[in-house]
């Protein structure tokens, strides 16, 4: 029975490279001269520190552009709330989402069932497995999910006959 997996994985090495490029650009840009803005990465989180909300937005914009250039979807980032830090600065923690949460998995399964395609979907840890009798139904399912905006970056892997 043909099947495929829906996963949401981010290449952390690419995130690390994008963060390093953003740090380098912030150090060189004229509008950040004299600013204490910085970006640090800890496992699956990126911490952004800036002088004020305007600088914070500019730093995040630089980071997003570097991530986009490295083919990392902005959908895989979850932004924490902006909080005050010491010295009158502001901080925001951005977490990099790995895997599909149970809630998103249920949402994906609901979309698939709603479409009335002859496939079955089930949640397996942090991925969703879709099985069907023929390959065309699976390909239609992939196209359906690509067309929907589920606020999550999805990759379709492990396509088997």
From Swiss-Prot:
Coiled coil: none annotated. GO terms for cellular component: cytosol. It comes from the Bacteria. Keywords: Nucleotide-binding. InterPro entries: DUF520 (IPR007551), UPF0234-like_C (IPR035571), UPF0234_N (IPR035570), YajQ-like_sf (IPR036183). One of its GO terms (molecular function) is nucleotide binding. Belongs to the YajQ family. Nucleotide-binding protein. This is Nucleotide-binding protein Glov_3198. It comes from Trichlorobacter lovleyi (strain ATCC BAA-1151 / DSM 17278 / SZ).
């Amino acid at each position: 029975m043909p099947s495929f997996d829906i996963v949401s994985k981010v290449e952390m090495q690419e995130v690390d490279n994008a963060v390093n490029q953003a740090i380098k650009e912030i150090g060189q840009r004229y509008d950040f001269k004299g600013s204490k803005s910085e970006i640090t990465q800890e496992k699956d989180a990126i911490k952004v520190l800036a002088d004020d909300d305007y600088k914070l937005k500019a730093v995040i914009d630089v980071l997003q552009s570097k991530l986009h250039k490295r083919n990392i979807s902005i959908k895989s980032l979850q932004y924490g709330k902006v909080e005050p830090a010491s010295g009158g600065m502001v901080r925001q923690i951005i977490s990099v989402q790995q895997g599909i949460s149970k809630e998103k998995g249920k949402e994906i399964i609901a979309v698939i069932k709603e479409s009335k395609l002859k496939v079955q979907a089930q949640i397996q840890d942090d991925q969703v497995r879709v099985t069907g009798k023929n390959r065309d139904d699976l390909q239609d399912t992939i196209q359906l999910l690509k067309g929907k905006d589920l606020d999550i970056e999805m990759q379709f892997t492990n396509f088997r006959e």
